[in-house]
Amino acid sequence: MKKDLKTLALARLSGFRHKTVRVPEWENVSVVLREPSAEAWYLWREVLNDGDTGDEPLSVVAKTRRNLEADVTLFCDVLCDTDLQRVFTADDREQVLVVYGPVHARLLRQALELIADAEAARKK
């Protein structure tokens, strides 16, 4: 049976490229990664601009912390369970920040690559 266009357009994650991946470091669980939302990009930009007064350059430590917080903002937006529900909310960012590591960064990179895939397809 063919679904109608409205149903397809309103389906969860229908507006995002997404893919399912296994995470060996997390007991080989499957997760769904999606492209970041417009809201996440806005919050990411807000984090990067925070503390940039222009008067005095940020220290290396402050820049590193700021960049990590920005990555966590995007990570919390792109990680979904296999029911296509986001795992984290913006309220979880501090908790994720404490444990954010290479596995999280690798998953974020894969989600961001979904955008690059879209750009490559446009060029064809």
Report the location of each language-model feature:
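Short acidic-hydrophobic surface loop/beta-edge motif
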Residues: 17-27
